[in-house]
Swiss-Prot record:
It comes from Homo sapiens. The keyword Calcium does not apply. This is Protein MANBAL. It is a single-pass membrane protein. Residues 48-64 have a biased composition (Basic and acidic residues). Pfam families: UPF0239 (PF06783). InterPro entries: UPF0239. Residues 75-85 have a biased composition (Basic residues). It comes from the Eukaryota. The keyword Membrane applies. The chain crosses the membrane at residues 24-44. Residues 48-85 are annotated as: Disordered.
Length: 85
């Protein structure tokens, strides 16, 4: 019985160039996704020079007129009538 067992490695074909390209491309994609998720989670401290410049445009945003008030829930918007041809 022991002589009947075959312990030789299975015959597996070598991966082709496209299979290798797909494999390593998927690895690179996964690493890129991890870097993107970490960039969102981990905040990066800004330098003092970068903080001074954005403060100027913010003051311009404050001077803008506020948007129109949201219409009340009870009022229905007017229906636009289609032109008859």
């Amino acid at each position: 019985m022991a002589s009947d067992l075959d312990f030789s490695p299975p015959e597996v074909p070598e991966p082709t160039f496209l299979e290798n390209l797909l494999r390593y491309g998927l690895f690179l994609g996964a690493i890129f996704q991890l870097i993107c998720v970490l960039a969102i989670i981990v905040p990066i401290p800004k330098s003092h020079e970068a903080e001074a410049e954005p403060s100027e445009p913010r003051s311009a945003e404050v001077t803008r007129k506020p948007k129109a008030a949201v219409p009340s829930v009870n009022k229905r918007p007017k229906k636009e009538t289609k032109k008859k041809r």
